[in-house]
């Protein structure tokens, strides 16, 4: 069925990202972080902070560790309404966006103490290191300043190129190398930017029944408001 303008109607269904360890691409910008995650359970402490700006890949890397350790996962803002001890029942826990202003500091401090007592593991994710968080509880601030910080830098060209190629492959879109190179030079250095653009390319290619060529991508980039397209946080 076609729309009045002759374009194919496209169901806006979610695309499932591949988030396994084999799907996580490694380059100089993230190799140190990946190596430390892979060292689990031989971590130097029972808690680590995984830090990186939006689009750096921290959500994907945290998911890699969650699967590896069979950890539970919780948003930091949900700690206030959670029963704390059961969160460490599996021996591992991911706490996402731990630097939020609505963080229950006493709950987090309790979790860190429990992890130490039970030899369980906690991975905190945030955009900034714990030393910069505006905490009110002195004991928590002191404890967090002592935990190792895993930093993810913005993706370098090698990583971003690999991610673009992988995203096309995930969506079963065949493109020339020239298309990948063209995209690489025209998007922000953030994995979220690549995901957002590839999702739009996929949608438009299906809608228009078009081959994904350099000219097709160029037209999409010209027509899009890049500010809105590339402002989303990482998946």
Where are the regions a protein language model picked out?
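A short, basic N-terminal segment
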Residues: 1-39, 44, 206-235
